[in-house]
Amino acid sequence: MANVSIHPAVDGGVVHGSTEGFAGGTLQCLCASNKVTVDVASQSAHNHACGCSKCWKPEGAKFSVVAVAPRDKVTVTAHPEKLKIVDESATIQRHACTGCGVHLYGRIENKDHAFYGLDFIHTELSQQSGWSPPGFAAFVSSIIETGTPPDQMDGVRARLTELGLTPYDCLSPALMDALSTNVARHKGLLH
C-alpha cells in the first residue's frame, strides 16, 4: 500500500518524537518574503489527517494534517494584513494568506460550538519539532469530493491504517463524544 500518497508529513511514516515540555512554535506562510507568521504558545492536540474539502492541503496531498490549539495561545505576529477568511459562511473561519493561499489558522466564532476556544492549525508550517503527531484520519470519504475515485478508497483506508492513522468518516470517537456532549448540555440533558 506504500504507493498511496496521503500527505508529505506522514507518507514516510508518522514520527512519534519527544513532545514532552514542548510549548509551541511559529507557523509561517509559504511566501518568499513578507511571510505571515503566527505564534502558537501551546502544544497542539488532536492532530490528524483530514480529508475534508475545506482544509488547506499542500500540492498533491489527498489529506491535510491539522491540529488544534487554545484560541488564546494563537497570535498573528507578522503581516496580518495579508490574511483573509476563505469562506465567511463556514463554521471554521479559515484565515489564509492572500499571497500564497496557505491557511494559517481556523477559528470558530460561534460560542455555542463544542470546539469554540480551539483554533485549527497546520503544524507542518512550523520549523520547530515537538508538535503532537497525527493520531487518526477524519472525513476520509470526503476525498472523493475532491477527485479521488471511489474505487481507490479501500487502498487509501488500508494505507492510513498501515500508517497508524485509524480512518473515520467523521471525527475520532473522542471528538464526536465532545460534540454530542455539547448538544446534550445545551438541551439541559447533561450538566
UniProtKB/Swiss-Prot annotation:
<keyword id="KW-0479">Metal-binding</keyword>
<feature type="domain" description="CENP-V/GFA">
    <location>
        <begin position="22"/>
        <end position="169"/>
    </location>
</feature>
<dbReference type="GO" id="GO:0008270">
    <property type="term" value="F:zinc ion binding"/>
</dbReference>
<comment type="similarity">
    <text>Belongs to the Gfa family.</text>
</comment>
<feature type="binding site">
    <location>
        <position position="29"/>
    </location>
    <ligand>
        <name>Zn(2+) 1</name>
    </ligand>
</feature>
<keyword id="KW-0862">Zinc</keyword>
<dbReference type="GO" id="GO:0046294">
    <property type="term" value="P:formaldehyde catabolic process"/>
</dbReference>
<feature type="binding site">
    <location>
        <position position="100"/>
    </location>
    <ligand>
        <name>Zn(2+) 1</name>
    </ligand>
</feature>
<dbReference type="InterPro" id="IPR006913">
    <property type="entry name" value="CENP-V/GFA"/>
</dbReference>
<comment type="function">
    <text>Catalyzes the condensation of formaldehyde and glutathione to S-hydroxymethylglutathione.</text>
</comment>
<keyword id="KW-0456">Lyase</keyword>
<feature type="binding site">
    <location>
        <position position="31"/>
    </location>
    <ligand>
        <name>Zn(2+) 1</name>
    </ligand>
</feature>
<dbReference type="Pfam" id="PF04828">
    <property type="entry name" value="GFA"/>
</dbReference>
<feature type="binding site">
    <location>
        <position position="55"/>
    </location>
    <ligand>
        <name>Zn(2+) 2</name>
    </ligand>
</feature>
<protein>
    <recommendedName>
        <fullName>Glutathione-dependent formaldehyde-activating enzyme</fullName>
        <ecNumber>4.4.1.22</ecNumber>
    </recommendedName>
</protein>
<feature type="binding site">
    <location>
        <position position="97"/>
    </location>
    <ligand>
        <name>Zn(2+) 1</name>
    </ligand>
</feature>
<dbReference type="InterPro" id="IPR011057">
    <property type="entry name" value="Mss4-like_sf"/>
</dbReference>
<feature type="binding site">
    <location>
        <position position="52"/>
    </location>
    <ligand>
        <name>Zn(2+) 2</name>
    </ligand>
</feature>
<comment type="pathway">
    <text>One-carbon metabolism; formaldehyde degradation; formate from formaldehyde (glutathione route): step 1/3.</text>
</comment>
<feature type="binding site">
    <location>
        <position position="50"/>
    </location>
    <ligand>
        <name>Zn(2+) 2</name>
    </ligand>
</feature>
<dbReference type="InterPro" id="IPR014185">
    <property type="entry name" value="Formald_GSH"/>
</dbReference>
<dbReference type="GO" id="GO:0051907">
    <property type="term" value="F:S-(hydroxymethyl)glutathione synthase activity"/>
</dbReference>
